[in-house]
Each structure stands twice: as C-alpha cells, then as structure tokens.
Amino acid sequence: MNFKNSLLTPISLWGDFDDSLPLKSTTVSKMKVDGAIISEVYFSGRAVGNERVRIFGYYSVPDDITPKGAILYIPNDNEKIGSDTFKEFLSVGYAVLAIDVYGKREGSVNHTEYPTAVYYANVVNAGRRKDFVDESAKETCWYEWVAVGRYAVKYLKEIGFDSICLAGNKIGANVGWQIAAFDKRVTCFIAMFGAGWTAYKNVCKFDENAKEPIEADDSSRKYVAAVDAHAYAPYVRCPILYLTSTNSTFFDFDRAGDTLSRVNDGVPCFTAYSVGYDAHLSESAKIDVLAFLETYIGKKSQIRPKHVDLVCKQEGDKLRFEADYGNLKAKNICVYVNEGVKYASKRDWVRYEATEDELGKRSVLYSIESKGIVFAFCSVEFADGTVFCSKEIFKKVEKTSDKKLSSKLIYSSKKGLNGLTFIDEDASISIFADKNIEEIIGPDGIVGAYSQSGLLSFKLCDPDFSLTDASILKFDAFVNEYCPLTLTLYEDDGEIKKYSFTQELKSENIWQNILVKISDFKSDVGFVIKNYDKVFAMSIKSDAKFVINNVLII
C-alpha cells in the first residue's frame, strides 16, 4: 500500500504489520540488585531497508521465585528505563521488561538504535513528527515506537511468557494504547496518564471559543485519525486499568474520560484517580495496580479491581450523586465535586462524604451554585485497601451567579483538607508520590496543614473569587524554627507567570496571624500582577517545616 499523503486509520496503519523477523537477542550484562536479577538486553526490531532497529531494554526477574507473569513497561520520554517506577513493578513478583523506545538521548550509553532513514524515531530528533503527520502516519516517531513495543511483546512470548501485562507511563501509555489495540498477545493493559488527545493539548473541552485542531490543517487531521491514542480505544479488547491525576498539566483529565467512553462495554475497564495531584500518582495506586496484576496475570488473587459508577439526578436546586459499587464492602465512599471551572488542571475538587439512606444506598446531595457546569466523580475505598473511582460526569446547570466575593475562605482545618493540595512537579524518578499533605496538631490542639514540597490551592480559580489591589491574604501559621515562607500567586495570561512574597517567621509556640497585601506580590523582575482575573492558584512553600490554617482573602 502507498502510504504517502494518505489519511490512514488505526486498522489501515497496523493491519498488515509484520513482526516475523528473528529477534537475534543478546545479553550485555547481568547483575543482582535488591532480590532481582537485572539483565541489559538487545534484540532486533523491524527492518528499515537493509537495516534493523536494535532494541535496548532491562529484563528483570525475581532471583528466588518463579515469576507469576511478565510486565512490559514503556516509560515516559523523560524517564530512565531503570527508574524507580520500573523497580516498583519489579518488587511484586513479576518478570519486567522495560524498553527504550525513545532512542538516543542526552547522557544515554545504551539505547535503542534506529536506522538513519528513521532518524526521527530518536525523540531528540522527532520535531514536528511528534505532533503532526505531514506525509503519512507511518512516517512518524510514533510508528517506530509502537513497532518497538510490538517486537518487545514478541521477545517476552519467545522466552516463555503466556501472560503479559502491558504498562505505559504518560507518553509510554499513549504508545501502549496502540499496541494493546492490535497485539492479541497482550493479556491486559495499565495506562498511566496517557490517553490520547495530544493534538488537543491546551484546548479546553468546555471552552466554547477554543478552536478544534482538526479544523486547522491536514497535518492535524491525519494525526488525530491514526496517531493520537484515543483513536485506538475502541479496538482494545483486553482488560484496562487507567490511572491518572485530576490536575495533570499535560494529560487532560476531561479528555481522558472521552477516551474511556470509547472503550467497548464488554471490555473490563477500571479507573482510579489521584485527587489534586499533577505529575504523580498516589501511593494507593500501587495497591490498585497489584490487584489488577494479580487478577489478570497472577496465579491467585486475594484482592481484585472493582467497578464504581456514579449516577446524577436533579432534585430542584440540588443534585443527588448516587454511588454504585455492587454489594462489595467499602470503608469510605465520597464524591468529589467542582462547579464552574472549565479547565481540568485548575479545579479545586471538594470532597463530600456520602451518607446512607433507608434503602442502603450511598449518595451526596449537592446544592447547585449556578456557575454553569458541575463536574463530579465518586471514589470508593474498599475493605481490602484498594481505591477505585467512577468515570467523571458533568452536568450543565443554569448560570445565574455573577457575584464576586470580596472575602472568601481558601482553607480551614474544620473542613478537612478541602481547598488544598500539594506542589507536584517532577516525576521522572518515580510515578508514585512520596510527598503529600500532612495534618499536624499545633498549639492549643488546633490542626493545620503542611507539605514538604509546598502547599497549593486552586480556590482562586473559582468563578466567584475576586482579587483586587486592595485584597489581603490572611492566614495563621505555626513554626518551631526560623522559617521564611515563600507565598506565590500564579497567573495565566497565555503563559504561566509567578508573583511571590516572602514572609519571615520566628519560632514561637503560638499560632501567628499573618496579613499580606496582594499588591506586595512581585515577579522575579519586580512586576506586579496586571490582571487579577487571570490568577488561578496560590502556593505556600519553605525549606523549613511550617503548619498553616484559616487561609482566606479579605
């Protein structure tokens, strides 16, 4: 078939893919590390003219037990294949093959070697081919990366594994959707963050003025049709576990829901969200992964993944959110709600505990605030420690609220941790977060909040929230050592800008009442905020330990 300038589909792109060439595998080194034997391996991939792609990976097995099955792990493009995430998969008794699909990168010694004709398969040379299809979907870095994954599945099959879980992180998950769609040797699929819609990056699903990328040009249309991972969701037939954060900057939470809605009804599909997180997943996601692995490729399963559904019914000026999780034992059921914030990465998700009615049904009755649209999902913590979520739902409501509040609470410990999350940035070492929010008892037995990485609030993105030159940030703080607190406001006027103020605190065994003028916040070069309507978040950070409470704008 002549692929030049053609508009391909997933089927026409991969329908005749041939991975019958011999692997010619070699082992470069072998070492014993933390109860596992890790081998550096090379094997051959597809042919490009008279040359073959030479694939590099880490193959690891437990040194004292027979592996229950195999995991093929595809990392993110800024992640080393021997990252802590790889080691997390290794620690639960499975063989793990972590492959490099991204080719030569800065500082890399061993890496997948691509023939010169497909130089763009090296991520540093991908250029436009990572985001557009100028000629054919077959002439993109994505095609080469997926082809590497297909040969990696073959490698695991040839060394004796019948049960193979494909797991991908971020960009690696987008690669994984394409593999899972057409490689029947894959038993199940774990996708972390990546769920397609790459061409729609920064295009808000709920912004009426946003321009659809497929309206732009042929290059975008061809990309969406055959490269973007969401196009592959209807073709996946194996069980899926989808894990993501609600506030990911790069992987849109709303768009991910659209991808999951494309999965066929008969395909087991489980979801779990790390609420308020950005680059990482919560520690509880590890238990969900274990349950999924044990169920589909393990020899036995004491814990299993669970389906959770959420139904929304309007009752006058209220919405009733009803949770459905079968007859399973649950420790905690809650519904997370945000009203009025269209951009997923900027939402402050408010947690509401579900109550039980006389029929045993668990639900939340939410009072509509008339901000145009309500977003919600249900999270259930089960008795076995797993936490699974419903798909996100949204409901348009009448928009009658134009009020701007001059005084508004951001956080109070009386309302739990609502209003706060933590600064969640670099996840190149491990996808699972080791830093979160702590609730700490301060003077007079009053509880406050602290995070080693810094506290962050999206409350300022609320449509009702108003900042002016006259606004004052007020909060209580407790420290037991000298503590310079860096307070930062985040503005989005097409690019993210930061404006900060440093508040120095001395050690005192009391709650110190702090007042800071919003007009005192400055950029690195001394500029003040020009458009307060564009401020969407605030952070509090210090190298010293601090506890804060009763944060509000007056």
Task: Show where each model-derived region lies.
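Surface beta-strand/loop "capping" patches
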Residues: E294-V337, V350-K361, K408
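Cap/lid segment of the alpha/beta-hydrolase catalytic domain
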Residues: K87-L90, A95-V146, G196-E208
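Extracellular ligand-binding interfaces
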Residues: Y450-G526, S542-V547, L552-I553
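Short carbohydrate-recognition loop motifs
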Residues: I431-S457
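N-terminal cap/lid segment of alpha/beta-hydrolase-fold proteins
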Residues: D19-I65
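Short beta-strand element of the alpha/beta-hydrolase
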Residues: F56-Y59, P67-N76, V96
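Short beta-strand/loop motif that positions the catalytic acidic residue
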Residues: V236, Y242-T244
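Primarily recognizes the serine-hydrolase "nucleophile elbow" in alpha/beta-hydrolase
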Residues: Y151-E212
